[in-house]
Amino acid sequence: MSFAFDLIPIGLEYIAAYIEDTVEDVHIVDMELEHRTFQDLINVYSPDLVGISLSATEHNESLRLAKIAKKNGVTTVIGGYHPTSVPDLMLSSPQVDMVVRGEGELTMRELVEKGTPKDVLGASYRKDGKIVHNMDRPRIENLDTLPFPTRRLRQYPYKSQDRTTDCDVIVMSRGCNGLCSFCCEPSMSHGCLRCRSPENVMKEILEMAEYHEGRPLSVIFADPNFMGNPNRVDRLSDLLMEHDLNIEFCALVRADAMARNPEIVKKMCRAGITKFEMGIESPNSKDLKSTKKGITTRVHGEAVQNIRENGGRAGGTFVIGLPDQTAEEIKTFPTYAKEIGLTAAAFGIATPFPGTEFYRELDKQGLIFETNWNNFDEMHSVYRTQHLSKEKIEEMATYCMAKFWNIDTLIEQEKVSQQRTGRKKALVDFIRERTSNVSFLTSNGNELQKDNFGQHIKTFLEAYADPRVEAYTRKVKVQEVLEITRFLRILGPQKIQCLLNLDDTTISFVFKTTNKTVEYIRVTQGRQKDSTINLDVDLKWLSEPDHSNLVERLIFLFSHNLSTKKLWNTFKLSVAIGTELLAWNLQKTRPQKTKPPQNSVPQSPLQKSAN
């Protein structure tokens, strides 16, 4: 079973592949997608053993499921980063029979073959009321000896947010030679990086493409440090360019590796590895030093430049709420992300996971106040800092997301994609994708911050007003990035105001258009008086999924367009939107042209900065 929120449970698929010839039957259940109850699953499969893979966030839920399994007489085995770090804690719960520490393939095979954990390396268990830790199992040095993950056991369609693209995961290496104090990987791999051969990885990629029957595919290289061995990445890129695959790859990389290897970055982008997520962490050198990141801020910009010059998309993650950070420092993070040219960014709250140096330091000082493992999710503050309260840190995470994910960033994303594809984005596709993104962020934000969701929305709105959006859209012509020629011709000169409101907090998006151009987009607080079309949205709707009052909401949406002129302008907007929808649907029903090879060279360099 797996609780992986954003990744396919490939670790369990590796284990299943390694043990399936020794057991009568094996099933993989992804609890993020499973709609049946756990008791129903027990009844259907009648398992002898249930293995649960988890992180710290799933600690409580895993114990709940293990308890159900034990009530049905099923042996329970727990594994993953979290159990590896706290095996005694896991075994203190009677519903846990065994813990697999470290890599699971060989240990699980021995457990099912022997039927006992005695003398099985990497296993922890109870004997006569005492916890026994067998010796650690040596790491698997030759990863090519492992069978490929058992994708055929999947019970669920893994799709992109807009449901148009298949998704998959692959791993080229295990471990990381980094020593970041907040990361779980050093405790698992002890700075040791092991790689599969590029030929072995390429063979799996071809099998994976066949499994998805040639459909468009988005694949994440889930390696903690994909560029840990640049020569192997270089060779894999050569192999990928020998095939015309309908696959776009994303990789997790270190900024210093991307800065040092511009030629390999160029080759990766030509080969279809076009999306990159880097641990930027902070624009402040003191934060990079205190977390033992092992890089300087100088490489941030160099890495992004190398990616963008080759048509790639550069994303970065930041850590906020470190022990000595101030609110003023954190407020600079989203600005810095835009300045160095990131087109995607996430701002996670510093979380001390067991097994990390970060956890040991804070635990020693008695600073960790949170006892509910559910909140160890990088969305909640769980320890005391020098300058900021728990509530303030969580608000700052919302502030950073709002400041970065503004309209200028969304347009910049399309500008980068256009650089690679040579095509403008259709307006309907742009709106559909952004609506999907907003819905995803809202639903998950509502779930994770449900006790204070209203305040977070207000913080989001207050942070969203930004004069840089207008400056950006005056400089970067929207009509050159989005295909809106027909839309603007029908709409004509307008000043459209879309006002978002929550209680007394309002923010306005103002779109100034002519027959041929979008002159600017302005994001500002309060209602603007000189608009030609008004659209009002009450954000309380976000927390009210019931659509029974849809007519009432539509009336409210257009309630500030009562004059004859504004009604006419609103009609023109409706016709323009309807025309775009009709054209989009007609386009979708036409036979699609053959997709150009992934290894086509980008047309021209991108600007280094989003602003």
Predicted regions and their residues:
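Flexible glycine/acidic-rich beta-alpha junction loops that bind and position SAM and/or redox cofactors
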Residues: M1-S2, G178, N225, N231, ...
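N-terminal [4Fe-4S]-dependent radical SAM core
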Residues: P117-V120, R126-M172
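Glycine- and acidic-residue-enriched helix-capping/strand-helix junction motifs
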Residues: S2-L12
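Structural recognition of alpha->loop->beta junctions
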Residues: L89-T107, V265-K275, T332-F347
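Glycine-rich beta-alpha loop elements in corrinoid/cobalamin-binding modules
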Residues: G11, Y18-I140, G355
